[in-house]
Every structure is written in structure tokens, then in C-alpha cells.
Design a protein with these regions (language model features):
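Catalytic core of non-heme Fe(II) oxygenases with the double-stranded beta-helix
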Residues: 1-110
């Protein structure tokens, strides 16, 4: 692994993120996705779960409640995922471990 990029994410009530991959096979340098949740006293009615799918055909997925201290890690190119609508403010730090995809001896820094 070459570097780590991250961002602080705030979802307001009603916000969601459609199903997607964090990297496309062979086209990006994100390798491992990591999410750390910062939400105290999260309740099932608060929504905002991360849903990880085994592949594009999986319609059920596995739901992860965004409770304080929960950490999720998954391969960026392998697992489609989404965030269901949040019913209250939802906070996390999302990040990606990257590999160096440099060419001609030039370093490929995080974007």
C-alpha cells in the first residue's frame, strides 16, 4: 500500500448514497476502503446503514449500523455498496488505502 486518503462525511436527514464501487477493476489505485462511524446512540429507526453486496447480482446485501466506534473494511474493487437514507445527522470518516500506479518513475499522489 502506498498512501491513505480520507474525508469526513456528514449525511443530513434524507441523504443517501446510491450503490457504487469505490474503484473500478484495473482502472484505479484504491485498494482497501475503510469507514469509521462517529454516531453515538444510533437506533435502528435512524436508518443510514451501509449495505455491502457480494457482487452486482446480490440484491440483499449485509447491513452495517453506523454506530460509534464501528469500523468496516472491504476491497474497493470487489464490493458494491450503498448508504441507505439517514433519518438523522450521520457522521463518519471514509478512507482508502491506495497503491502507486506511477509510470515513468513519477509518483502518483492521492487526488
Amino acid at each position: 500500500l502506498f498512501s491513505f486518503e480520507s474525508h469526513f462525511a456528514h449525511y443530513s436527514p434524507g441523504d443517501f448514497y446510491k450503490r457504487h464501487y469505490d474503484a473500478f477493476r484495473g482502472e484505479a489505485n484504491r485498494v482497501l476502503s475503510v469507514v469509521v462511524y462517529l454516531n453515538h446512540a444510533w437506533q435502528p429507526t435512524d436508518g443510514g446503514e451501509l449495505v455491502l453486496y457480494l457482487d452486482d447480482k446480490d440484491q440483499e446485501g449485509v447491513k452495517v449500523t453506523p454506530s460509534f466506534g464501528t469500523v468496516v473494511a472491504f476491497l474497493s474493487e470487489e464490493f458494491p455498496h450503498e448508504v441507505l437514507p439517514a433519518m438523522r445527522d450521520r457522521y463518519s470518516i471514509a478512507g482508502w488505502y491506495r497503491v502507486n500506479t506511477s509510470t515513468a518513475d513519477k509518483v502518483d499522489p492521492p487526488r
